[in-house]
């Protein structure tokens, strides 16, 4: 089939056109494994936090995340004819519960016929959808909160990492942990490190400071004041050196208009996390269905995916909330 015939086929019979990238069951089409992998890879690779967090491909709507650990010492002094007292491991469990989300990409017939990708159009379609999907996905994973935002808002549909983290520092209110209106960024980062569980500070290079652009610039400026090559690199090349061994990342998702709104959202946020402790899951089937609109001379491609996010251990990490009031105890 030549290019023109192929494109005409996509316009006139879009269901046939996507057969090469999907597996159909009872009229519902899901991406083949290689295209599923492409969708997830391209959705996450440009997202600072999502690309570093640990991904689980879910084979069921509910997946348990188990962890074990010891709350007391295991090793003890040996005494002849005396049995060790023994230490039982503590078990805990978190859950990922996949929720379905949908999105639509509309392409008019003229654009489709002029498409320069020709036979690679199906892959291009996935790339178009996954890139934007990834931006929204990361915003939800970070800022999601079922008790905030307006009804119908994407960020209200699930709880994200900020909501699920148990260690929080507050910048306003009685008993606040820091003064959100005036604290220096390096002072706040020092305080966040102090609040981080000490047992999990063994390898600081595995941790991350995630900062919105404003705070990242403040950190660059603070480092840039040093009369050294480190200061020159910071201001001249926008290089953020690690803070006390912890890499510092600019996470543009923390600039999200809704999530960072001081009235409906969380406002300004800084995070100190171990990405391997931040878990997100996506159900192994991503759906795609064409919806032909002949009167409008266009075809809408409806994507659907199920996902959730959480922690292996919600107590390992620190979130600093500049504009949130510390709850009364």
What name fits each language-model region?
Residues 2-46, 53, 59-61, 156-190, ...:
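Sequence/fold signature of self-assembling virion shell proteins
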